[in-house]
Amino acid sequence: SSFWTDSNNKTINDLIDFTHTFFAKHTLINVLTKYCVFTSERMLLVMRPYQIAATERIIGRINVSNNYKQYGKTEGGGYIWHTTGSGKTLTSFKTAQLASRLDYIDKVLFVVDRKDLDYQTMKEYNRFEEGAADSNTSTSVLQRQLENKDKNGGYHDYRIIITTIQKLSIFI
């Protein structure tokens, strides 16, 4: 079972505190519209409070980095630390999905350090939403995706791309 917590992952045991937090109009609307996934297996997943907090902080950091033009600077980066089995893939999926909807974001690259993670991440993303992201089998496919070209040279808008650090390094 899962308990509601605050943004510091402190359990909210008091029912009145919970209702003030969860049933606040903006919280409830955000949970329903941003932080739920109806999977390809027709199962509803609701993000845990710490996943929501992580996603909101990443999106907040992206917004600050854009507003203050901190591209490529340490101040513009960050990381989220989750333990094994804590839902990192769901957190990254929703973060990538929400970031890809920002007006000033052309693409979201989700970079993994191993080929098996590339496959595993794509499989999970497809479970969350079929076709929400694209993966690649080579550097040339990655280049095509970055240029918004399909395999026949026509236009295709690749918004979320999953790739390996090795393919990205070769491309750059």
Question: Where on the chain are the PLM-derived regions?
Answer:
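Inter-Walker segment of RecA-like/P-loop motor cores
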Residues: 127-172
